[in-house]
Amino acid sequence: VMDDSDDRLAARLAPALALLAAVGETGHVTRAADLLGVPQPTASRRLAALAEVVGAPLVLPSGRGIRLTRTGRTLAAASTRALAAMTAAAREVREEIDPGSGRIVLGFLHLLGRTLVPSLIGGFRERNPGIRFSLAQGSRQDMLDALHEGEIDLVFVAPMPLGDPGLVSRPLADQELLLCAPPSHRLATRTRVRAADLEGEDLVTLEHGYGLRQITDDLCAAAGFEPRIAFEGQESETVRGLVAAGLGVALLPRSDHPPAGGVVEIPLSPPVFRTVGVSWPAGERLTPAARAFRDHVCSHPTDLGPAFRPPRGKRSGQA
């Protein structure tokens, strides 16, 4: 339980957060001073004064630089976290004043970067030219983890995290998944294939943590067999290339372009779709710029090509 002395100590430490964080980052008083734009003697005096306030040394000499003591490391780490929170707050305050000039950190799966992301961003930027985007790509699990940790504002993801109470999701489109096989494969001449036809086949798929991997595993389980995974990758184009080389078959979205000569795309029976959606943190945690983009995405149907259809998936959470 924090007592009054803790409050008083925290209040005296607060003005030195930037110095403590800079010393922790650089390991050198002079470099920390340069980073903050203050004279080195001033930084040294402030550190000495802080040590007196705390009652323990914060730094020790180490070669030509310094190293933090255990107490110093604790305070430097806390200072870094506190400054990150203040930076985020300053950004939000600035965007509250001028929502038209904010920055949106948008996460998405690799497979969605060709059509969905450019289409949705392009339409929004026409009406909001001052808003900037930082784009992050990764696996489904990586993107959802980053969303929970506040590293990104929104994520385009499939399948949607409908069971996560900390996130709100809205469907955008359903994307058909097809079996990709080399032309010489026994299934290549079929007009349709069933999931059960894949039993015993060498499958090329994405690693665990990717949405397509989960869909592949679930489809095989529903058909009553465990998939025989021959190769795992992190990029759909790598998976497609392995299929073209005759190393297995794969479940992938329809190609944006006519498939290359080394790959045949075969619809499944019944058809298999995955719902692509947008997810964001529950509650009022979005900046004005991110809220504007979310509203644009959720209210503007976009023609994304033959691989997509209007969504039939469910939504989750409260906006």
Regions found by a protein language model. Name each.
Residues S101-G163, G233:
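Central regulatory/effector-binding core of bacterial HTH transcription factors
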Residues S139-L144, H148-I152, A158, E207-V264:
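Hydrophobic hinge/microswitch elements
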Residues D164-P171, Q175, E237-G283:
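Beta-alpha-beta core module
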Residues A51-R70:
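A short LG(V/I)-centered, amphipathic sequence patch enriched
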Residues A21-Q40, G55:
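Short helix-boundary/capping micro-motifs
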Residues L116, V264-A307:
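A late-sequence structural motif
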